[in-house]
Amino acid sequence: MIEDDNPEIRQQCEKLGEYFSSIGERSLAESLFIRAENAQRAVEIHIQSGDWIRAHQVAQEHMKSDEANQVLAKHAESLQQNGELRHAESLYVAIGDHDAAIAMYRKAGNRSDMVRLVAQHRPDLLQTTHQHLARELDAAGKAREAEEHFLGQF
């Protein structure tokens, strides 16, 4: 019988996990990292490969909820800083932080994606969002764009 709490076994599982991750065997690497009690690394291999759904599943299954959300939010922020807004959005939405995704697009000046997310996740705020954007654009002298939002609120 193999004892799970043996540090040498956990260390070997870590090494094997890194090896299998490096050759693209994410499923096996994930199992080894979980066995080594390193759920965060298991989540990271899925994030690195762009498998946001699996990263979220592993985090939810093997980490405390707040810890999982914190790890995924940290990666979303990193993706956002690197300009990978769609990937960051996927992570924010996966952890239920729709407002962070909306704010990210607002900060980036990407109004169409911001409005899309408001419509999907905060429909009660859609009209208010259009009004605010219309006033903001009108004040900036962008009458044509403002008009689209004035019309979008009806």
Summary of predicted features, one role per range:
Residues 1-154:
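Extended alpha-helical assembly domains of large eukaryotic scaffold proteins
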